[in-house]
Amino acid sequence: MEYGVNVIPEIDIPAHSLAFTHYKPEIGSDKYGMDHLDLYKEETYRFVDSLLDEYLSGEKPVFIGPDVHIGTDEYNAKEAEKFRYFTDRYLKYIEKYGKNVRMWGALRWLKGNTPVKADNVTINAWSYDWIDPNASLKDGYKIINTCDAYLYIVPAAGYYRDFLDTKWLYEQWRVGKVNPKEELPEGTPGLLGGMFAVWNDHCGNGVSQQDVHFRTFPAAQVLAEKMWRGKNEMVSYEEFEKLCKQMPEAPGINLLGRVQGEVVFPGQNEELSLNGTDSIATMLPEIGYPYAVEFEINPDKEQNINGILFKGLIPPYMPIGKIRESWLSAVTAIRLYSTLLHCLPEHGRRYA
């Protein structure tokens, strides 16, 4: 908060809760899977109460901002009444600490008679099937457009967008377009705005932190423009995109690895002979996407190689073990390994 950024923490309950059931298996649901908390066990409520108390109470609480998110998405619809009771209970539980509470839309999918607190509650409107935006506003909820069809990024997954369609968002989307079937009028009271979401569903698939940033920065730019200005027919998307590429990420920040101007290295296109311990470095700490690296490897008789083949800030690439059995592996800053399907050659064979 001291830097002017409100980080909204989320403890995702009662589904998507494997982190808790790994620690405490007895509160997991035998019927619906261990990613669901068992809503019929008293121990579940004792555990969640103590967890929230730990993060929200005391002289130095962990959650210091004004808002806290409690998840509540994608619980099994067969338990609608119990889910609604659980949700209502923890909306009130968080509020007693003086926090504004947020939740994912679920009450269209989990219809029922059990009332769920609406005052001072903000809902992420993420799916037509799960939330009725008009009914939610009528009941007194505030909503944020987080429509999965338009605003979800799930890198390299195949079932949601890998990159947002920034051109379509700039030219066609508006914050009232809460899902493909429903649209709210401009200026609808209770519609606070919109946001995109990134879900890294697949770990170890070769997608690095930089890869995620490469996807999210253009999304942040176009949504910021739409939130502040709305539709702008005076500036084409092509002009807007050109301006975006000229804008830095922040003072002194270059996570995209942009290189200004054309770089020509002396001695390019010339053959260089190394003695086995040499290294070559450029004046550039990194080069962002799009880029390509081409090189050849012609190993000598020594087969035991364990070292970095080439590296930038993120990630280094290295052969592991003996050359003939090795693969190129990418190692990120958080030590996740991803394998590139290229075997290094034996002595006397060239690799390119």
Label each PLM-derived region with a short phrase.
Residues 264-337, 348:
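Extracellular glycan-recognition modules
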Residues 88-93, 107-113:
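N-terminal active-site wall of soluble small-molecule enzyme domains
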Residues 101-110, 117-119:
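Acidic, contiguous N-terminal accessory segments
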Residues 113-121, 127-269:
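Flexible, acidic glycine-rich loops studded with aromatic residues
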Residues 10-16, 73-75, 106-109, 126-128, ...:
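Active-site beta-loop-alpha junctions enriched in small/polar residues
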Residues 1-97, 101:
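Substrate-binding cleft of carbohydrate-active enzyme catalytic domains
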Residues 340-352:
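Trp-centered recognition loops
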